[in-house]
Amino acid sequence: MNITNLILMVIVLGVAFAIVRRFIVKRQNEEAEDKIQVDDSTYTLNVMTEFVKKRLDEITKINLYDIGLSEEELKRRKNKKYELKKALKGCTYGDVNDKKYIKELIYDMLFNEYGVDEINVSKAIPFDIPSLLTAQDKFDIILYMYKNEFGYEALPEVIKKYNLDDLKYVEGEAKPCYVITSEEISKIYEQENFILTFEDKLNVVVQRIYQHYKGYSSIDEIRDMNIDGISGGVSGLPESFLSQVAQTDGDYLSQIAEHKVPRACDSIWIMFHGKSIRLAFLSFGSEAELKRVCQNIYKYNNPGQLSDTNGFKINEMKDGSRVVVVRPSMSETWAFFVRKFDVKRATLEQIIRFPGKDEAIDLLKYLVKGARIISLTGEQGCRKNNNAYGYD
């Protein structure tokens, strides 16, 4: 009997020792993981984005009751956790306040925890070597600097200052069109000759991380601007077409690979003062990213699931913008249209710029004053609603 008890005691002690040892090793591994392993890729956008995702996931899923906090501290931490969850959800609805909160949190994480400084911040975006900056990098910097001065009028100010809404001829097009090219963005960046502080650089990096994590990809900041609207995926070749020609036309595929033929995920258009302007220098990068934006941009107030059987959704965003989203098989590709109604009112003289406009404007005014029944037709973004409701 004594021998049996002794054996049981040895077994229990052995199991207890194994559990304690495993716990200690696990804690040591966790501490080792918490330390940032610095290498050549540590401060790239992709790696920092994964770090931000992991940290925010840890913060929102931590069990506060296991930490042993005081009652007051527990209440405070619970409120902060609730606010964070609410803000992360509100980001996808277009709430600019939630967006600002999350961006400030990401800024603190990168600066205080991840160790981003004046030197390594340029590993994410090569701020100090303009020749290595992409058109999107330059545009992000331009928009950030103008936003500091003009707020949500930043993009309209850039467009008006450099006449980016004028008709122009571009290579491969027989007719003039409304388009903003990467060459124009590079020229603007060179002329502006911005001097960026470390805070400016880190804020640009934070915005880039945010827009691929919780934002609307390349259009995230543009959507907030005071413009008439924005759309994506509405032109260019869909993935379904690319797969069909994959085994038939090698020359055509080589043109696509060189980005000479625009894809649907390269399609970004803004509506500005009644003009549909293509942003040729911007892209979602892949159909998966365009799909992610489409799946998030319409979800304010839970309008229902966008599915193969229900291939479109019409809804409003939190700021009152109207959003329409379509998906295959109803459409050839994923696409969205966002119309904003909080822009400055344009006059008829600004909208109608063709010869003989005075007579057309006077006629329209008298028809409205006479309470006549009028049918207003035209392409998307030509301000039919504004005329109908008397805003113009």
What are these regions (language model features)?
Residues 5-23:
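N-terminal signal-anchor transmembrane alpha helix of single-pass membrane proteins
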Residues 229-237, 317, 321, 387-391:
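Short amphipathic alpha-helical patches
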Residues 255-370:
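P-loop NTP-binding catalytic core
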Residues 360, 364-392:
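Glycine-rich phosphate-binding P-loop
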Residues 22-29, 390-392:
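Short, intrinsically disordered, charge-balanced linker/junction segments flanking boundaries
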Residues 29-306:
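N-terminal accessory targeting/assembly segments
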